Amino acid sequence: MANPGWGLCTYRGADGADALGALRHADGVVVAVPGPRYGGLIAAVAEWDALEQRLAGWEPADLPAVPDAVLLAPLRYPRKLICAGVNYGSHMAEMGAGAPDPDWAAWFFLKPPTTTVIGPDAAIEIDPDPDEQVDWEGELGIVIGRGGRGITAEDAAGHVAGFTVVNDISARGPHRREGAPHDAFRYDWLASKAQDTFCPMGPAVTPRWLLPDPDDQRLRLWVNDELKQDERAGDMLVGWRELVAAASARVTLEPGDVIAAGTPAGVGMPRAQFLRHGDVVRVAIEGIGTLRNPVVTRTRAATGARLAAPRGG
């Protein structure tokens, strides 16, 4: 199918308020969407049925740009940010984990949405200690539009609003801790996955009516224009429908929740390559968009400036 030409986004207007818009991929222009003004996509997705009815068939190609629009993370903020771990066979192989079992099942961890999620061009802040070994993980993000518990894989598509791009930034150094009081505490998921700015997301959400199935879309990631990851999004061990079902078997999914679907081969750890101050990371998924973020060393001044600014990025 032809790649969709736009996605739903959140922008900050000249009045300083968040608003729902549409991002045209061809020229990067933000345009207004018809209907009531929402305070961003997170507010609109709570009324997904009405939004879908209003925008299905709508085309923003010839609309004027919103003046002085600043693009933010599309969802500010998901109630839950659920991340699938080890969901590509190629990534398992490069990490020395062997081949997946035939009955491989999904497993998940969580990131705190309000402090990890940043938007396009916002800075990924990393600790200056090189032993942190901060890595990249380009991923497909599944955005929930209709909530539920115990959703079947067959019904999952009807609960999905659309798809976005996620970068699951990961600190490899502190992930495994020595001297843990029990095997259950050997891995420090807070230090590894949940640090501030460790979940760039965006630039927009492609509605599912424009991209019914992302499986054939190409997922790529570059660091400083060097291609690191390149794989078909649908090469997941557990498909996106099954991920929705597996997550909803444990928790109630709510509109605006995001499930990050795991990363393919090409991360830095097996090659001893990690992010450094001044790097620029780009993640692109065909039909969804390109997410770009610079990398900066975390300093007290930089963190203070980010926290003092209007929330999000």
Predicted regions: what they are:
Residues 2-4, 15, 91, 125, ...:
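Catalytic-pocket segment enriched in acidic/His residues
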